[in-house]
Amino acid sequence: MNCPFCSHNDSKVIDSRPTDEGQAIRRRRECISCSKRFTTYEKIDEIPLIVVKKNGNREPYNRNKILNGVIRSCEKRPVSMKDIENLVDGIEKQIHNTMEREITTELIGNLVIDKIKDLDGVAYVRFASVYREFKDINTFMDEVKKILSEKPSL
């Protein structure tokens, strides 16, 4: 590590501790040449996640796209923002657990469908109608009937 004061390339570590909830390491160093102290941070270099769209295009993963879709589906429903954040956190955890560098919009959509179904039935139907591209009222009604047969309390 080059010293920011004299540019000497040798230093010794005085102190080392985890920061950012264990996502980084903060190191206090002392230059061997000029004896000045400085701080460095060590972080894992995360591999960017790429989303493969239905048309084959690729784009960087964007949490806000999932979040906005779920928020729209839960509009005017008794669902708190905390519940929505937790739902999206759970989806992200599942995505990262796949250990894949590329993930399809189909997989993301299915994860949202599975999670939102347990959160709110109306939000589920709203999301499913857009995600599954319901063509007519019969498709919509079939999905509602399926939900009602699974959860008669709706």
From Swiss-Prot:
A zinc finger (unnamed) spans 3-34. Keywords: ATP-binding, DNA-binding, Metal-binding, Nucleotide-binding, Repressor, Transcription, Transcription regulation, Zinc, Zinc-finger. InterPro entries: ATP-cone_dom (IPR005144), NrdR-like_N (IPR055173), RNR_NrdR-like (IPR003796). Pfam families: ATP-cone, Zn_ribbon_NrdR. Binds 1 zinc ion. GO terms for molecular function: ATP binding; DNA binding; zinc ion binding. One of its GO terms (biological process) is negative regulation of DNA-templated transcription. Its cofactor is Zn(2+). The keyword Transcription applies. The keyword Metal-binding applies. Residues 49-139 form the ATP-cone domain. Negatively regulates transcription of bacterial ribonucleotide reductase nrd genes and operons by binding to NrdR-boxes. NCBIfam families: transcriptional regulator NrdR (TIGR00244). Belongs to the NrdR family. This is Transcriptional repressor NrdR. It comes from Alkaliphilus oremlandii (strain OhILAs). The gene is nrdR.
